[in-house]
């Protein structure tokens, strides 16, 4: 998998395309959430769901947060139980609500 930085929509990209073996499989979200945290997330094509990509991307994004010495936040749409499951699986804990989403913060 590879981040395609050139696909960014601003000077400091917020959304990156993701590919595997040359095929587009979705996007990752990676941007400042506040001064101390980055928001991470993913939007994957339905035909790649259940193959572990979300977990792989989550690990990669957590590593990027650590390089920046920042925490990680995942905002979960309450209708997406899988997102909540992945957040909890990787050590995120519920920390509140924002704009109708459940907010999970990585506990280190």
Task: Write out the residue ranges for each language-model feature.
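Conserved acetyl-CoA pyrophosphate-binding loop and the N-cap/start of the following alpha-helix
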Residues: 48, 52-61
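GNAT-family acyltransferases
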Residues: 1-47, 63-64, 68-71, 75, ...
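Conserved active-site alpha-helix within GNAT-family acetyltransferase domains
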Residues: 55, 79-95
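Residues that form or flank phosphate/diphosphate-binding pockets in enzymes
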Residues: 39, 52, 82
């Amino acid at each position: 998998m590879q981040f395609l930085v050139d696909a960014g929509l601003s000077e400091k990209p917020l959304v990156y395309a993701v590919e595997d073996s040359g095929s587009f499989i979705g996007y990752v979200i990676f941007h400042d959430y506040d001064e101390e945290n980055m928001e991470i997330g993913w939007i994957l094509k339905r035909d790649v769901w259940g193959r572990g990509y979300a977990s792989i991307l989550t690990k990669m994004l957590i590593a990027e947060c650590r390089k920046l010495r920042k925490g990680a936040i995942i905002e979960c749409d309450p209708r997406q139980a899988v997102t909540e499951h992945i957040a909890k699986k990787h050590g995120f804990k519920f920390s509140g609500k924002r704009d109708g989403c459940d907010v999970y913060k990585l506990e280190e």
